[in-house]
Amino acid sequence: MSESAKPRITSGSKFRNEHGFSAIKDGVKRSSSNTEGKSLERKPKWLRARMPGGERYDAVRRNVTEHRLSTVCQESHCPNIGECWTNGTATIMVMGSVCTRACKFCAVDTGNPKGWLDPEEPENTAKSVELMGLRYIVLTSVDRDDLPDGGAAHYAACVSAIKQRTPEVAVEALTPDFDAVMSDVEKVVDSGLDVFAQNVETVKRLTSRVRDPRAGYEKTLSVLAHAKKHRPDVLTKTSLMLGLGETEEEILETMDDLRAIGVDILTLGQYLRPTPNHLPVERYVTPEEFNRYRDIGLEKGFMEVPSGPMVRSSYRADRVFDKNNLGLSVPEVPVPDKAMQIPVKAVD
């Protein structure tokens, strides 16, 4: 087929080719050819999320829209968006909604933002946290390999702005790996956050199949280890998806690797395939297995191990922080009346 005859594919579209997955090409995410002809798997009965709705959910949604925020809840098609937003908690995705990497499990758009950042984002994010009356906020972001520091300074500015406006709010930062440039990692760790998170995503053997080639199992471990070494008082956290073909032995080995570098909190959840062009689910892990892995994780010394089919890395992170085995807690912050009165006009 000639170039002119090929169908036009918009930025971020997923498609297959004979070469399999090849990260980024003109803003297009390519997915593995082994998904050809496969439809989404039928989910077991325990994988059911309630439909989003309610006054608090609508307030959070309006706030996200009016303040031009990207949330991982929306971009990753998270099944828990209804529960989390109804409870007034949200995970805000900073630095835009286009990622420079193309992991094979992820629904977030892939492309080249060409160095663009919203200079108003730190202040808008801080104002939104205040308006929503949150006591715990998770900040995450796309990878920004197009920026010299991977976006570390901008990320740190977002955390600092929240702390300056609402110092009582606990902040968790679920960050990129910043290509393991530790001076950039330190910018975020020193920004005033309470929890530093970087997801290992899968077991070592499956990393090259599941994650973008620029990511890495050892790279993630090195970032988490450095964050803990640089600021021993900060809680460190990571997440592992199950159902991608890993064995129980590999799960336990991953737990041991994480505990060896002092990771405090581990979340375990079922991988759910976003589209037919993403990696297929190899199997659905039962709730009973998730409960057993939680018990094993606690025995290995993790402070907390949220584990279940619907658990995601930032799922009800406020409760995890409250209940961790150190006895640390987030101060109660009353929800202001204005949390339900989201302004129609966007913040300038």
Curated annotation (Swiss-Prot):
UniProt KW keywords: 4Fe-4S, Cytoplasm, Iron, Iron-sulfur, Metal-binding, S-adenosyl-L-methionine, Transferase
UniProt: [4Fe-4S] cluster 1 binding residues: C73, C78, C84, S314
Enzyme class, broadest EC rank: transferase
Location relative to the cell: Cytoplasm
Catalysed reaction equations from the record: [[Fe-S] cluster scaffold protein carrying a second [4Fe-4S](2+) cluster] + N(6)-octanoyl-L-lysyl-[protein] + 2 oxidized [2Fe-2S]-[ferredoxin] + 2 S-adenosyl-L-methionine + 4 H(+) = [[Fe-S] cluster scaffold protein] + N(6)-[(R)-dihydrolipoyl]-L-lysyl-[protein] + 4 Fe(3+) + 2 hydrogen sulfide + 2 5'-deoxyadenosine + 2 L-methionine + 2 reduced [2Fe-2S]-[ferredoxin]
EC number of the protein: 2.8.1.8
Coiled-coil residue spans: none
GO molecular function terms attached to this record: 4 iron, 4 sulfur cluster binding; lipoate synthase activity; metal ion binding
Family that this chain belongs to: Belongs to the radical SAM superfamily. Lipoyl synthase family.
Annotated source species: Marinobacter nauticus (strain ATCC 700491 / DSM 11845 / VT8) (Marinobacter aquaeolei)
Positions that bind [4Fe-4S] cluster 2: C99, C103, C106
Cofactor-binding details, from the entry: Binds 2 [4Fe-4S] clusters per subunit. One cluster is coordinated with 3 cysteines and an exchangeable S-adenosyl-L-methionine.
Keyword Cell membrane set for record: no
Residue ranges of domain Radical SAM core in the record: 85-303
Known pathway: Protein modification; protein lipoylation via endogenous pathway; protein N(6)-(lipoyl)lysine from octanoyl-[acyl-carrier-protein]: step 2/2
The protein, known as: Lipoyl synthase
